[in-house]
């Protein structure tokens, strides 16, 4: 059994790797075929591939300015973000599981029919001495069928619920963003100055926000909308619904559907430990875990908001009204986990805030303060899993991998670390690497004014810090983005290493 489970886990990892590589390569090809806005500003090949990987892994790390891309290329990036988002990927997994369960049910049905033909032949032969015994045998054959049918129906119902959430958030979100832009002269003027279509902006922004990518079709990300508090408040629920609070939202929808229909599979999923009925869908959690998760998210956001307001009220937030400052602090706090849309230049934030951002970017979305003993349906402690846990424990921890990545970047960029220490600081590299690992997209950027030996040919660009790295450094960060997108397969590593 452990061998088969390890093979299953390895197969899932291989499928995920193949999926993200395929859509990244497809995006790279399409971005190369389609024309950019200005022919002379076409990105280099490695920058095109970097952008495609960044969109597919919903990382929003950037090496080129977003306004370089034409409307057609923005559509390609929108599709990549849609396909790479966690909710969509889990939806594909549910569809695959539903198809497999339906196929298994059809196979069982054919076997039962063949057994029924044999039993009918036995009855015709006169073997009717113990009808009670044969009835019990038939009932025992039906009981597993009932459990399998319940599981099949649960997966099917869950697929439709997740699909409904996915569709409603995108439709309502895009319409709401477009309505705000059309109603706001300032926002409409901003898009007009950048030659951006309102609906392209609305759809792109909604997909990017719900998938927790963080790309915006503007060079400055959300900095140009830092005075548009209503727009930020429209995006905050989309950020939460697509990431840290997706599990509580899903649980609430399952509970509402169960209360409205009283269908057996929905009632089973709504119960504590209903993940078993839903074939272990990772985003379906018991009610108590959902409540604690929501409380943890609220606490993290409150701490981040308090620190940003306390340290940047007269700094990075200067020039805004008190209401706008509070909303901007909320927007930054929510986006630190893990969307990466920003309304301020992160390089001017206090180091204490940046360190806390690094911690928030490192933590998984469902990090929860949960001081309760897990029950048997939640805790994975079966004897058959010992082999899997032994294999996982021999791997390095996530912090060890991040340390290796930071060291590798420091080696590839060692010359710039010496010549341009204010821009190429270790903190800037750590922020960039952890942001790529967490698929966030926060970056401290690069400023020509911080150069110790000014280069008169240097021009400031609205790109991430990685845009100034060597090709070797960019390739390492591409690997980090893939690794971060697939980190759920290695989260339990490093347990064999004892520090005391």
Swiss-Prot record:
Q: Where is this region: Disordered?
A: 121-145
Range of residues in the leader sequence: none
- Transmembrane: is it a keyword of this entry? yes
GO MF, any single term: monoatomic cation transmembrane transporter activity
Instruction: Identify the species of origin.
Output: Oryza sativa subsp. japonica (Rice)
Protein name (Swiss-Prot/TrEMBL):
Probable cation transporter HKT1;4
Pfam hit, one: TrkH
**What's noted about domains in the record?**
HKT transporters are proposed to contain 4 pore-forming regions enclosed by transmembrane segments with each containing a potassium channel-like selectivity filter motif.
Cytoplasmic compartment ranges equal 1-12, 95-156, 260-290, 367-390, 485-500
Supply the alphabetized keyword list. Answer: Ion transport, Membrane, Transmembrane, Transmembrane helix, Transport
Q: What does this protein do?
A: Probable cation transporter. May be involved in regulation of potassium-sodium homeostasis.
Topological category with respect to the lipid bilayer: Multi-pass membrane protein
* Record InterPro entries: Cat_transpt (IPR003445), TrkH_K-transport (IPR051143)
Query: Major location, coarse class?
Result: membrane
Top-rank taxon, per record: Eukaryota
């Amino acid at each position: 059994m452990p061998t088969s489970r390890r093979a299953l886990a390895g197969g899932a990892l291989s499928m995920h790797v193949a999926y993200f590589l395929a859509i990244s390569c497809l995006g790279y090809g399409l971005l190369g075929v389609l024309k950019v806005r200005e022919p002379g500003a076409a990105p280099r090949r490695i920058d095109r591939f970097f952008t495609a990987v960044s969109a597919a892994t919903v990382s929003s790390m950037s090496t080129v300015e977003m306004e370089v891309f034409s409307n057609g290329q923005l559509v390609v990036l929108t599709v990549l973000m849609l396909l790479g988002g966690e909710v969509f990927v889990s939806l594909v997994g549910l569809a695959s599981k539903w198809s497999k369960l339906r196929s298994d049910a059809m196979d069982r049905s054919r076997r039962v029919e063949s057994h029924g033909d044999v039993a009918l032949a036995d009855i015709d032969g006169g073997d009717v001495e113990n009808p009670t015994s044969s009835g019990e045998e038939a009932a025992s054959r039906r009981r597993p069928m009932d459990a399998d049918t319940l599981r099949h129906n649960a997966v099917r119902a869950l697929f439709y619920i997740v699909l409904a959430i996915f569709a409603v958030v995108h439709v309502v979100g895009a319409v709401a963003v477009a309505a705000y832009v059309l109603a706001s002269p300032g926002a409409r003027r901003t898009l007009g100055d950048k030659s951006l279509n309102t609906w392209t902006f609305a759809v792109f922004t909604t997909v990017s926000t719900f998938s927790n990518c963080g790309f915006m079709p503007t060079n400055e990300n959300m900095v140009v909308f830092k005075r548009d508090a209503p727009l930020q408040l429209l995006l905050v629920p989309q950020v939460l619904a697509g990431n840290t609070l997706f599990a509580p939202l899903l649980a609430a929808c399952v509970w509402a559907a169960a209360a409205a229909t009283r269908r057996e599979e929905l009632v089973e999923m709504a119960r504590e430990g209903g993940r078993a009925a839903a074939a272990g869908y990772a985003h379906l959690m018991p009610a108590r875990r959902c409540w604690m998760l929501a409380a943890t998210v609220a606490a993290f956001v409150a701490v981040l908001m308090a620190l940003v307001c306390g340290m940047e009220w007269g700094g990075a937030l200067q020039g805004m009204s008190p209401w706008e400052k509070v909303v901007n602090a909320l927007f930054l706090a929510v986006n630190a986990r893990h969307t990466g849309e920003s309304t301020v230049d992160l390089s001017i934030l206090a180091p204490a805030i940046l360190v806390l951002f690094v911690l928030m970017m490192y933590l998984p979305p469902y990090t929860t303060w949960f001081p309760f003993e897990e029950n048997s349906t939640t805790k994975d402690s079966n004897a058959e899993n010992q082999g899997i846990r032994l294999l996982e424990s021999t791997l390095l921890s996530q912090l060890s991998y991040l340390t290796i990545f930071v060291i590798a970047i420091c080696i590839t960029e060692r010359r710039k670390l010496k010549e341009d220490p204010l821009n190429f600081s270790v903190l800037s590299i750590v922020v960039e690497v952890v942001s790529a690992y967490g698929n966030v997209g926060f970056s401290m950027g690069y400023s020509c004014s911080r150069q110790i030996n000014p280069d008169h040919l240097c021009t400031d660009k609205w790109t991430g810090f990685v845009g100034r790295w060597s090709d070797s450094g960019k390739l390492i960060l591409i690997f980090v983005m893939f690794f971060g997108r697939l980190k759920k397969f290695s989260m339990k590593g490093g347990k064999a290493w004892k520090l005391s």
